[in-house]
Amino acid sequence: MLERLNNAFAAQRQFTGNAAHELRTPLALMQAQLELFSAEHPDVRPETAEFLTLLREQTERLIQMTRALLEMSNLQQVARNERIQLAPMIEEIFTDLAPLSDKLGVTLTAEGDGIMTGSDALIYRLIFNLTENAVKYNRPGGSVRVSVTQELEKLLLRVSDTGYGIPEEYRRSIFQPFFRVDKSRSREYGGAGLGLSLVWEITNLHGGCVRVEESSDKGTTIAVELPAGAETEPSGADIS
């Protein structure tokens, strides 16, 4: 039974990766043509300009989606044997997110450190996605705290925000592909709806688990538990 499920998931990943790969070129051409048309026709009517802006935004969203789907389909092939120190990585992520956090007036703070074995690129993506999500769905002037605690053979990462909270009935669903709690804010900030799904995939691939630790109208904390050593077998965690 387990072998059948693994084969089904592998086939699904292969199909998803192939579909995303085939979409990349036509989407890039669409984006280029839209940019060219906009540059050559700067004085179009307001309603046409608004329509062109909408087309560019939706094309960019589709490009982001295909990029994320390609990442997800290729995760199994990524080596996971690098030594990773998290504190410097988190500071780098804060620097990359500074334009967004400054724009929204959200303060970023970090505490703790830890060392683990895994894929540097994937763990960066995991923490980046969680932190970016916490910034996007925060209150104006809010804060995000990323903390790391190391305990013998495991490492606990927590990302806490001062946002509006996640309803209890959605706390497992948020890690499923394309699921969004607040669709209006998702439209405002773009994105493919795959950020937290990718977090779950990366965590699972490193033999860990991810969950909503607590959430209320005062904010949310998402906790990721990872083995500190070289364990890389998927945990098989259920998010249904």
Positions of PLM-derived features:
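Short alpha-helical segment of the dimerization/phosphotransfer core of two-component systems
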Residues: 54-62
